[in-house]
C-alpha cells in the first residue's frame, strides 16, 4: 500500500469514528491490505466459501456451466473470520448473518459516530437463496432466475431491517446510507 492512498475508513477513524467492515473484501489480506490494516477497528469477513453447503435443507442453489462457477462451488467450506482470527461456521444464510451482525454494530454504537461498511455477497454468484424466498418467486420462469430473485429478496429484507433499526434508535435522520 502506498502511504498516500488513504481509505475512507482511515479518514473516519482519525476523525473519531468507530469503523466496522462486514462482508466481502477484495483488497487481499497480505502486506498491510487486510481490513484492520485499512482503517477498520473490526472486520467480519467470510474466508472460505460464501454459501451454505449445497445440501443444506434451507437453501436452493443455482449453478452455471462456467469455469468460474465450478471453481467457486468447489473452493471450500463455509467459514467466517473476525479480525483475522480463527475461522468459524456461521449458523445461517450469509445475507441474514451479515445483516444480524450489522444490526449489532448499529445497536452497540448508536451513541457515538460510526462507519459501517456492509458488503453483502448477494447478488453475486454462486447463486444461493433461502428456500422460503425462492418459494415466493413461483410466478417466475426458470430455476436460476427464481434463485437470483430470492437473493434480491433477501438483500431487500436486509436493507429494510437496517433502515428500521436506524429509525428505532432515532439515528436515521443523521445517518448517510450509500447503496
PLM-predicted stretches and their roles:
Residues 1-179:
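Formylglycine-dependent sulfatase
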